[in-house]
Amino acid sequence: HSEPGGAY
């Protein structure tokens, strides 16, 4: 899925 800020 897509998350705000990106996956860290």
From Swiss-Prot:
Protein name per the record: Unknown protein from 2D-PAGE of fibroblasts
Organism: Mus musculus (Mouse)
More details: On the 2D-gel the determined pI of this unknown protein is: 5.2, its MW is: 50 kDa.
